[in-house]
Amino acid sequence: MLRGPAAVWAALGPLLWACGLALRGGMLYPRESPSRERKELNGLWSFRADFSENRRQGFEQQWYRTPLRESGPTLDMPVPSSFNDVGQDRQLRSFVGWVWYEREATLPQRWTQDLGTRVVLRIGSAHYYAIVWVNGVHVAEHEGGHLPFEADISKLVQSGPLASCRITIAINNTLTPHTLPPGTILYQTDTSKYPKGYFVQNINFDFFNYAGLHRPVLLYTTPTTYIDDITISTSVNQDTGLVDYQIFVEGGEHFQLEVRLLDEEGKVVAQGTGGRGQLQVPNAHLWWPYLMHEHPAYLYSLEVRLTAQTAAGSVSDFYTLPVGIRTVAVTEHQFLINGKPFYFHGVNKHEDADIRGKGFDWPLLVKDFNLLRWLGANAFRTSHYPYAEEVMQLCDRYGIVVIDESPGVGIVLVESYSNVSLQHHLEVMEELVRRDKNHPAVVMWSVANEPASFLKPAGYYFKTLIAHTKALDPSRPVTFVTNSNYEADLGAPYVDVICVNSYYSWYHDYGHMEVIQLQLATQFENWYRTYQKPIIQSEYGADTIAGFHQDPPLMFSEEYQKGLLEQYHLVLDQKRKEYVVGELIWNFADFMTNQSPQRVMGNKKGIFTRQRQPKGAAFLLRERYWKLANETRYPWSAVKSQCLENSPFTL
């Protein structure tokens, strides 16, 4: 049975959700349709970093007014990618400040001459603060490095004879106590040790602060009266799937809406009209997680057709949205998907790879998903920021469950709990929910990772932040990931699921694996006794250098990583029979961090190397995850790996 607050949110949810999201406008993923076109702007862009002492030469000289090459030497920079690792310039790799991107785009004639066409520039991710100009005219600004933003540039490209447009984007990767993630700038004033004006960026998170245009940049079109946003929520009544929809239209008041829901064979299973309604699907195929059902990840297609009357005549807009029918609920000791107990056995990840940095890359993405399925993982957390939209789409298609996390990592300073920080964090959650609300794979929001939640302002901060997120989306539980003491954590009372990180026999009691079982069991018992909420072991692991071997195991050897995991698993197997509902290894793959004596070319806690090659622990974890899958499958039947036919153990 749902707890009291959950029941309240369930009752108020549809009204609050619609109101919250209606305030901001939509962020539908740009899909081609009979009424919509898109033009990718990925490839080589002109690039220049502003190395001036105050980092503002580009603004003082107005580099955006003329082609960037006229301002001085430029580099070719691939988009999407981080700029840090592409070149051979040591200064550029660690650069902090403004960098400038530019691209000329040739537009189809119909885009520039048809005043009934709306032309939109969409930037998937620009880390961290971005200012955008088109043909020297300011069109957009955006704070935050992990979520998309757009600008309607129709008037600029339809106002003259030009069939092209010059897009200039200035990006600043500086982090302050009020950004997400936060950081500080340290100025070194001792001129006997440092040059005049020398400064460094300090951060309180353990991954490299890659920067640039990390995700696709594109142009797309819609009619001037268009489908701006769609919000769906799903439920199940016996064998009937219920799809509640709300459609938001911009650019006109006189229109009709037709809605059809198609199954995977293209058959219409339900239809409706109007901007709000409910579709009933008899004998619905539910969206199930990978390995939980013999037919996981079933997706319907919601086809929306808008017909509007304008001064120029009748116009139409079409948009198709993938829909998975499923429910999520939390009890005192279970996490339920479609009313059945779900156990998270998965990983934490990073968007990180050689050369690309955090740049989106299709081959890498497909490789990662093949490894997840080989591993038998059914879930991951987007540690520690929202991932690319294309990642979320593959999770929907493959049935990989997602804990969708905001970039609220490293919130450890009192200044980062200010009203300024809180307001920005609230806006980030609005953007995240607006983007990912319709993904069936997303089953829980995480508003932060390892904040200093014992600080006095943390209670009000997380109470407000979690309540706001629930108002935006009451259909999903909300959490944050903690490493604070259970007695001191001021944010834990407001979460639906306790997510706790611990590194026994790694960051303390070095090498003493014999204490893991006692310490881990005590951790679980303390948290559950205090809050009576389900618990996920959201991080655990050990750094391992691939090829290092030592028996008896020593730290950094492959044997130590495996031995540490085995000690955790003994306790997890006991507690998952009670109230532990998941385990997520840290980390899926090795990743880059800042340089320090504690890091050897990055964090090495991956069960795969940064090049996606398995360490010994990957095989250990694979055996465990496939056995867990067989124990938790519904309806029960033995499953076999889709990625490896011959296996040394029973799958």
Curated annotation (Swiss-Prot):
The keyword Signal applies. It is found in: Lysosome. Inhibited by L-aspartic acid. GO terms for cellular component: extracellular space; lysosome. InterPro entries: Beta-gal/glucu_dom_sf, Galactose-bd-like_sf, Glyco_hydro_2, Glyco_hydro_2_AS, Glyco_hydro_2_cat, Glyco_hydro_2_CS, Glyco_hydro_2_Ig-like, Glyco_hydro_2_N. Gene3D superfamilies: Galactose-binding domain-like (2.60.120.260), Glycosidases (3.20.20.80), Immunoglobulins (2.60.40.10). Residues 1-22 form the signal peptide. Keywords: Disease variant, Glycoprotein, Glycosidase, Hydrolase, Lysosome, Signal. The keyword Magnesium does not apply. It catalyses: a beta-D-glucuronoside + H2O = D-glucuronate + an alcohol. Its EC number is 3.2.1.31. Coiled coil: none annotated. GO terms for molecular function: beta-glucuronidase activity; carbohydrate binding; signaling receptor binding. Plays an important role in the degradation of dermatan and keratan sulfates. Homotetramer. It is linked to Defects in GUSB are the cause of mucopolysaccharidosis type VII (MPS VII), an inherited disease reported in humans, mice, cats, and dogs. Belongs to the glycosyl hydrolase 2 family. This is Beta-glucuronidase. It comes from Felis catus (Cat).
